[in-house]
Curated annotation (Swiss-Prot):
Involved in bacillithiol (BSH) biosynthesis. May catalyze the last step of the pathway, the addition of cysteine to glucosamine malate (GlcN-Mal) to generate BSH. The keyword Nucleus does not apply. Pfam families: CC_BshC (PF24850), Rossmann-like_BshC (PF10079). GO terms for molecular function: ligase activity. Its EC number is 6.-.-.-. The keyword Coiled coil applies. The lineage of its organism: Bacteria, Bacillati, Bacillota, Bacilli, Bacillales. Residues 249-270 form a coiled coil. This is Putative cysteine ligase BshC.
Amino acid sequence: MQLTELSIRSQNLFIRDYIEEKKEMTTFFDYDIHSEHTWKKRYDDLMKMSFPREALADYMSAYHAKFESAAMRQNIEKIRDKRSVMVVGGQQAGLLTGPLYTIHKIISIIQFAKEKETELGVPVIPVFWVAGEDHDVDEINFVYTSGEKGPVKQKLSLHNVKKAAAKRIPLDQEKTEIWLRDVFSTYEESAYTNDLLVQLLRCLRKSQTFTDFFEWIVCDLFEEDGLLLFNSGDLGVKPLERTLFKHIVETNDEVTNRLNESQAAMKRAGYQPIIEAGDNQANLFYEYDEERFLIEKENGRFFISEVGLTWTKEELLKEVEEHPERFSNNVVTRPLMQETLLPTLAFMAGHGEVNYWGELKGIFEHFHLKMAPVLPRLHVTILERHIDKKLPVRELSVEEVLTNGVKEKKDAHFQQSLPDSFVQAVEHAKRELANAHGVMRQEALEIEPNFEQLLDKNAKFIEDQLQFVYQKVAQRVEEKEGYILRDFERIENSLKPLDAPQERIWNIMYFLNKYGPEFFKTFKNLPFSFQNKQQIVKL
């Protein structure tokens, strides 16, 4: 296994400037991630703050007991140490861990925590925030597998889910096992297939919900690393969140104003905000009849129009006090909850998260908080040996494929494969027939002027017939050189499937099935660098 790096620029201008230090970013962030002094400064700032360490450790101890992990228990006890801090990142609870970027983010969290623990000489705990409150089920109920014509979405069908949070979505054991076996039927059987399938079925048997299944698999993959899981949808954590929920209700209009101001500043700087939040949003969700609804506000009242609920501010504060388990954060307030509960040395973010966190600085200031340093996660591409060998044969580089895909080179190759004499003959036929048809058209219109539409259709028909012949010949050339076409398709499907980064489409199980547990152990411990470059792992 070999690790190399490539500099591939983001298409998002805000991310590009953030990574490349093109503009002063203090307007949007509290810390400069490029400064070597940032981590000590952030640590000193955290030591001046107060966190519910004992209550948090007690809760985490109870939640993680089911995993029976010594490494987890050790890190949970570190929470009680007032010197300890955390590296935090999160994601939705996708099936089989979801796209590869979830695995890459977890590796980022663990490796950066180890690096800073050595550098600062204090306990640094890796924490993965599981978005158990998320109710966008269609974003997590599938994986992609490889089909004859590229990636195929393998979806686990669900019934009567409504707007339930992931933590509440029950897993039908029988249906999920059938789905899992269907996924594995698309993989080539290897020496590792049976053991991996048994391991996943064991995780499934222990799971009641989507979130459970996700957590058991993550625990299996990273148990020895002591990764802690913070399930934001778990009812046990809600009493710890009560205080901030109240502050959000009490100063709701100011939260909205600060967001609007930050987004306006971002637009003035030439960037595009991505948070879609109207002035009537209260930035909190409320669970009613096992569904999750966004609370809105107007004229001093809070309401959920879909179910006819309404509160005054005082009534809503009372509801938070008595039933914090009914409330959850939205994209605006989740970072605030993280900052108040967890001593976060660094937040490990995807590019989209970097963008939206940049819209929240004013809200952090309103709550007298500093936003944790927002560090872009590792972006990794796995380059399999058979793909690596095909690249030079097809005159492609990894950088070229990741940046532009293969279509241009593929089309150029087949254009060159058509004999020039044939292409010229078709073009000549088009010109000659067009000229002949023009003469005929003129004669026909002198006899019957109303034939103009008929003649237009006739000309189009003749042109289409020539194009039909051209396409049939081109198709036959492609068939004769099918192995070349398949090379281009295999390269594309591996490195840039569906014109997207590999890590956004493929799932880790394909690689675990093909290369086994030792591959993953080596992979997750590679010496990745946090220099905001594309990490290329050659197998």
